[in-house]
């Protein structure tokens, strides 16, 4: 039997501020409906999801404000860089997310965009609640203290 050529997961874009600005409750993987020029542009590695979010609309979940720049060789057949993109999820997942967003005041935040083993573009989506300023300060203090503990332990040896 022929062996499969296993490709590792390749991260394309990451939202580093999301874990600082939001308290993450749950994560899940979603596919994205893309055009051919968008996939080619993503393969060039220039896309960003730092200021993007997901929004439920008409029984579907849409990725808003994600920047996938135009593919240079596509000329007139190019896509719009910040167009809303449909996220591909199961109906049960969509209903769960829509309920959490509407009833509990939570937000859908993309954490990272990556190619899976099969070469498909996937989005790791988080169901999160926004942090207040004092919560962010607490997070920063804890992180600084853990760094300081590491330094002290290395110094003592």
UniProtKB/Swiss-Prot annotation:
Pfam families (UniProt xref): SmpB
Molecular function terms from GO: RNA binding
PROSITE patterns with a match to the protein in the record: SSRP
Paired cysteines (S-S): none
Source species: Rhodopseudomonas palustris (strain BisB18)
CDD domains with a match to the protein in the record: SmpB
Basic and acidic residues composition bias: residue spans: 132-151
Family designation: Belongs to the SmpB family.
Keyword list, A-Z: Cytoplasm, RNA-binding
Cell compartment(s), UniProt: Cytoplasm
Location of region: Disordered: 131-157
GO biological process terms, semicolon-separated: trans-translation
Function: Required for rescue of stalled ribosomes mediated by trans-translation. Binds to transfer-messenger RNA (tmRNA), required for stable association of tmRNA with ribosomes. tmRNA and SmpB together mimic tRNA shape, replacing the anticodon stem-loop with SmpB. tmRNA is encoded by the ssrA gene; the 2 termini fold to resemble tRNA(Ala) and it encodes a 'tag peptide', a short internal open reading frame. During trans-translation Ala-aminoacylated tmRNA acts like a tRNA, entering the A-site of stalled ribosomes, displacing the stalled mRNA.
NCBIfam families given in the database record: PRK05422.1, smpB
Gene Ontology annotations for the cellular component aspect, listed alphabetically: cytosol
Database matches in InterPro entries: SmpB (IPR023620), SsrA-bd_prot (IPR000037), SsrA-bd_prot_CS (IPR020081)
Name assigned to this protein: SsrA-binding protein
Source organism phylogeny: Bacteria, Pseudomonadati, Pseudomonadota, Alphaproteobacteria, Hyphomicrobiales
């Amino acid at each position: 039997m022929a062996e499969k050529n296993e490709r590792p997961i390749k991260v394309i874009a990451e939202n580093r501020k999301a874990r600082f600005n939001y308290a993450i409750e749950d994560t899940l993987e979603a596919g994205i409906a893309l055009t051919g020029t968008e996939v080619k542009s993503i393969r060039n590695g220039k896309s960003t999801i730092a200021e993007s979010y997901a929004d439920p609309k008409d029984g579907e979940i849409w990725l808003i404000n994600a920047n996938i720049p135009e593919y240079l060789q596509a000329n007139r057949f190019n896509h719009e860089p910040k167009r809303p993109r449909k996220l591909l999820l199961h109906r049960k997942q969509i209903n769960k997310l829509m309920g959490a967003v509407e009833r509990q005041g939570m937000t859908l935040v993309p954490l990272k965009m990556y190619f899976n083993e099969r070469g498909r573009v996937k989005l790791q989506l988080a169901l999160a609640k926004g942090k207040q300023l004092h919560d962010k300060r607490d997070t920063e203090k804890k992180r600084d203290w853990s760094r300081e503990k590491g330094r002290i332990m290395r110094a003592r040896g």
